[in-house]
Every structure is written in structure tokens, then in C-alpha cells.
Amino acid sequence: MKKLTTIFIVFTLALLFVGNSTSANNGSVVEQNGQLSIQNGQLVNEHGDPVQLKGMSSHGLQWYGQFVNYDSIKWLRDDWGITVFRAAMYTSSGGYIEDPSVKEKVKEAVEAAIDLGIYVIIDWHILSDNDPNIYKEEAKEFFDEMSALYGDYPNVIYEIANEPNGHNVRWDSHIKPYAEEVIPVIRANDPNNIVIVGTATWSQDVHEAADNQLDDPNVMYAFHFYAGTHGQQLRNQVDYALSRGAAIFVSEWGTSAATGDGGVFLDEAQVWIDFMDERNLSWANWSLTHKDESSAALMPGANPTGGWTAAELSPSGAFVREKIRESASIPPSDPTPPSDPDPGEPDPTPPSDPGEYPAWDPNQIYTNEIVYHNGQLWQAKWWTQNQEPGANQYGPWEPLGDAPPSEPSDPPPPSEPEPDPGEPDPGEPDPGEPDPTPPSDPGEYPAWDPTQIYTNEIVYHNGQLWQAKWWTQNQEPGYPYGPWEPLN
């Protein structure tokens, strides 16, 4: 596409954080901030002022690429207030290595972001191919092409290794040497834009990278977490890395457990959001998809081009939208008029004994209040307006009355695992070697193999049969909250 001329506006009052106004008065976020760089471990704009980007990550473009288009990204900018979008291009699992045409969807996302004046992350999404060196030559070719096409645009951020993982894949031995070959390819075309490098153990071990940093002034280190699995220990690792002067970008996080499903864990997510805000850490939430998992931002049937109603947002999506809007100084509002049946007027019949609680009012904004509606008390789980208690099983209201709710407040897990892996659990300890002792009587079932991919299979390990509950590789049976269910 024809290159755009980036207009840089000099402010007399420095911005402390990236806002997100796209009005004619303020210009786009890229017009406001221009070329990003790192100073003293902090992401800053062209004026040297600290910047905090907030936005969304796609799911795998080979599976859910229909949600990545100009209209959906524009809606995320205008309605949610995002300042960054991450295009997650899986390398394996049906991604770029098997189907190079998926890079066309990356280009579509990048060019939309440039037109819309937001930042964009080009994500080389390694996952089941746990060692980034497996496809190092392909990575060099890909980033040579991307940096040649888009290196003149300050919008672009390169993420060269999503989640290195596996007990042998460490920063010093595998990840840093890989980065030292890939980054120079980018720098030959693009000397200035930010490069994000993944860290060991599914981009959790930022402390290792902080102790042996790359020799590039504009490198950041990826940190990923899932609110239902990860807590204070990982926050301590981030603080250690920051204390060593390492620049951290939370290029992926979820409200769910580390599997991408389970939850949502909104209280824990809020702790993490506060943590990131206090440290001015930029972030992208996983993920823009309608997949049947709790980390998905959209409900099944959501419009791929944006304009999402309240009914089309999942609990995670509604929560993340509001968190981004808060920092973007966008007044709270419903996404669009809901597609659910009109709730009509508030319950005109005074409850027989509602105590101190008022009747639900569709015109009222609620965040944590308790209301009375249809003979029952309800409490808002997050920000809501004009969403009737009980009208949506995945909605913002939790029943408090004596009668049990007709549907669970969280989406039920799928009866069968999805064929695509989603994000595997990065919270497991290293599984070590497979059980070297053959089972005395495993019957027809093979011994667990850490190199094998499992989705629903039964294996024998440590004298016991185990069945995979979802996609897994290199995660040893027997760890709590993991992907394996004991069968005997």
C-alpha cells in the first residue's frame, strides 16, 4: 500500500501515559507519540515521555483470521480505545510454516493499524514448536520481508518468539542466540522500531533475560500470564527484571487459567492490571475470537467486523473492554444497543421483602451493586448498563437469592477438546524426562512421551493411567491443575 506520511505533533504538556483519543483535536495515538524507544528500561515516545500501550491480541490467524480486518480493528480503536493490536501468526499447528499465505492476514492487520494510527505487533507465534531455533531460517526470511515493507512506519513492533518452552529451552543456550541472529536481519531494514523477544517457560522467566540482556537499545522482553494460574511469584520475577533495567512488554495475558479456559478470574485479573498500571507496563489481552473458551473476548456468533453488542461480548471481553476504556478516558457505555429482547421497564411491582436493595433499572450504571429483579437479588460482577439480570447466562449478573441459578455463571467447558491447541498451560513446572520404567501391565495404552502431542488420548505414567483433557505436549501427568486426568 502507499506509504503514509506520519505527522508528529509536539505537545507543550508531556503525556504521562498514552491516552487513546482519536479526535481531530488530538490526532491518532501514533501522531501523538511517534517513534517509540527504550530509555532506562521504560517504553517512551519520541518526546521521551513514558508510554503505556493497551490492546488486544488476535487468536491464531489460521483459525480465527476472520476477526482480523480493518473494520474490527477500527471498532476496537473507536469503541474499546485500544492503542495496540497484536497479529498472532502461529508458525506450526497449521500456521505459516505449513501455509505461508497466512502472512497476508498479518499484512492486512499491519496496514489497517497504520491507516488507523495505532501501534501493531507482528507476532512470530511459536508454541508447539517450543524451540525458536527450529524455524530460525524461516523467521529470518519472514522478518526481512516485514521490516523491508513496514520498517519506515513507527507503528510497527516485532515480536520474534512468542513463547519459548520446554525444560531444555533456556535463555542463555537457545533464545538469546536465536535473537542475536534474527534482530540484525530486522535492523538492516529498520534500525529503530521496538523488538520484543520471548523468554523461557512460555515467556515467564524474564528474570533470566534480565541477567543477560541483548545488546540492542530498543529491545523489550516478553512476559505472559493468565490470571487464574499465575500470581505473586511471577510478579516478583517481573519486579526483579525491572530492577535490572530490563524493559518488559506483557504481549499476552488472559483472564482465564493458563489453558485459555476456566474462569474467568476477574478479581485476580484486576490485581494484575493494577500491577501493570503501577509499573507502566504495556499489554495485549488474549484473545479476539469467538472460540468456546473463557479467555475469548467474543461470544459464539459475534460479528467478525466489529459493532459488537453487549450480548456479543464474553465476560472476559466485557471486562477487558472496560479496563481499556478507563485508561483511554472514554466514558462508560454499552458497546451498542443489545440484541437481546428489550428488557422493557424496570420491575414495577415492589418486592415483597427486598430489604434495602432497589429494583433493577435499565438506565442505571452498575459495577458491584445489588439489585432486586423478578423476585430475586442480583449482584453486578462488572460494569453493566441495560443488561437485564437473568437474560443472559454469561452476563454480568450473579444471582444471590435462595433459588439456584438456572445456568452456571461461567461458561461450561466444552464436552470435547478443540482441535486447535489454543494457548497451552505455561504454568506447569518442567516435566523432566519420561518415565523410563515400562509399566508392568498398561494394557493397550502407551507410556507417556513428552515429545508427543495429546488431545484426548490415554497414557500410562508412574503406575497410573491418565487421559488428556485438552491439547498438551511436554506437560507431565500428575501436576495439579494440569491437562491430565487420572483414570485409576
From Swiss-Prot:
Residues 417-433 have a biased composition (Acidic residues). Pfam families: Cellulase (PF00150). Residues 332-353, 405-416 have a biased composition (Pro residues). The active site is at 163 (proton donor), 252 (nucleophile). Coiled coil: none annotated. Residues 326-362, 388-451 are annotated as: Disordered. It catalyses: Endohydrolysis of (1->4)-beta-D-glucosidic linkages in cellulose, lichenin and cereal beta-D-glucans. Keywords: Carbohydrate metabolism, Cellulose degradation, Glycosidase, Hydrolase, Polysaccharide degradation. One of its GO terms (molecular function) is carbohydrate binding. One of its GO terms (biological process) is cellulose catabolic process. It comes from the Bacteria. The keyword Nucleotide-binding does not apply. This is Endoglucanase A. GO terms for cellular component: extracellular region. Gene3D superfamilies: Carbohydrate-binding module superfamily 5/12 (2.10.10.20), Glycosidases (3.20.20.80). The gene is celA. Substrate binds at residues 59, 63-64, 90, 125, 226, 258-259, 286, 291-293. It comes from Evansella cellulosilytica (strain ATCC 21833 / DSM 2522 / FERM P-1141 / JCM 9156 / N-4) (Bacillus cellulosilyticus). Its EC number is 3.2.1.4. Belongs to the glycosyl hydrolase 5 (cellulase A) family. SUPFAM superfamilies: (Trans)glycosidases (SSF51445), Carbohydrate binding domain (SSF51055). PANTHER family: ENDO-BETA-1,4-GLUCANASE A, GLYCOSIDE HYDROLASE FAMILY 5 DOMAIN-CONTAINING PROTEIN.
